[in-house]
Amino acid sequence: MFIVIEGCEGSGKSSLTELLKDRLIAEGKAVVATREPGGSPLGERVRDLILEPSTPSISPYTELFLFLAARAEHITKKIFPALESGNIVICDRFHDSTIVYQGIAEGLGKEYVTSLCHHVVGEKKFLPDLTCLLDIPADEGLRRKQQQKSLDKFEDKPLAYHTKIREGFLSLAEAHPNSYLILDGRQPLEESLNKVMTAYTELALCK
């Protein structure tokens, strides 16, 4: 099973990814947790290049194709082998983040970026079985980030940008209600975890 955790900056998705991994392992499941950008040596280099605030400005198109290249490598080297071996794969961000950030917020076009993402994802096996969206008001998410650490390139963008991100994720969730689980990012993560586990159990019974 392939589970993706999505959300705005500061929503808690990375923490939820770890909690979900730990809960599933405690139940005796074989789990691989990964992230995007990242998940492979190439992906981690792309992550460092794009997110590092000191990196000279690059165009949204360049960012897009770097993300897609990293995803192709990630799928080939990590996600596909893990799924083929019977692991549950949990990914902190996947192609919906690209659609929202580059397609919607950066203005490259939702349909255009979606088409490119689908070419990279390829066979249906690489589409998530479940996408969990931690939804949180953009201003609250940014406040959390500002309290935690120095901001990366995307976290440092203005509130209007992050509002577009939130609206973009919600529009995708509305368009794909059968594969999306919307979670309130303001509630305790343990509550979100329990809801994800319920959704996971229901899906597992259908497989």
Curated annotation (Swiss-Prot):
SUPFAM superfamilies: P-loop containing nucleoside triphosphate hydrolases. InterPro entries: P-loop_NTPase, Thymidylate_kin-like_dom, Thymidylate_kin_CS, Thymidylate_kinase. Keywords: ATP-binding, Kinase, Nucleotide biosynthesis, Nucleotide-binding, Transferase. Its EC number is 2.7.4.9. One of its GO terms (biological process) is dTTP biosynthetic process. One of its GO terms (cellular component) is cytosol. It comes from the Bacteria. GO terms for molecular function: ATP binding; dTMP kinase activity. ATP binds at G7, C8, E9, G10, S11, G12, K13, S14. It catalyses: dTMP + ATP = dTDP + ADP. It holds the Pfam family Thymidylate_kin. Belongs to the thymidylate kinase family. Phosphorylation of dTMP to form dTDP in both de novo and salvage pathways of dTTP synthesis. PANTHER family: THYMIDYLATE KINASE, UMP-CMP KINASE 2, MITOCHONDRIAL. This is Thymidylate kinase. It comes from Chlamydia caviae (strain ATCC VR-813 / DSM 19441 / 03DC25 / GPIC). The lineage of its organism: Bacteria, Pseudomonadati, Chlamydiota, Chlamydiia, Chlamydiales. The gene is tmk.
